[in-house]
Amino acid sequence: GYDCAGAVAFFKDKPKNLKEFHRIKGKILSETELEKYINELPKKPLAVGSDKRLSLAGAQDKTAVVMIKNKIAIPDDTIPSTNILKPAIQGFDETIENEYICLKSAEKIGISIPKIEIGKANNTKYFLIERYDREIKDGKIRRIHQEDFCQASNIPSAYKYQSEGGVDFKRCI
């Protein structure tokens, strides 16, 4: 995808320098456009069917967005996203509040968390979280390389969880 976690991206044409800062730009969505975009996520995961490509791990529907003047926008071309937007998991309407409460609880005990908020586009609720693998400076953004423990330990993603042979806490430290 054009917008993968960290500093990895796949391009059909000439690759861009992923270490450079890029001016944040994108198409700002109206509330109605945002609601439609969110509601289409289960049918078009990871921007399938558009000229955008992104890669976000996990089973939950989500999309990568940029914030422009406190408005949600779809990033232009290969511009790194600033935030991840997640609707509720279908059939589990409280997942948005659950994620919000868990992160705020972590913050209360001194764990640093990214900026988060619960938003609403017409009748559609969403959870918005700022990306930790980005650096923003003077209105420009760049990707920060990161790896999860499976990547760092050369463990296939099929063994993501400890119960399936993935890394345990002892191996992480």
Predicted regions located by residue number:
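Phosphate/dinucleotide-binding and metal-coordinating scaffold of catalytic cores
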Residues: 1-173
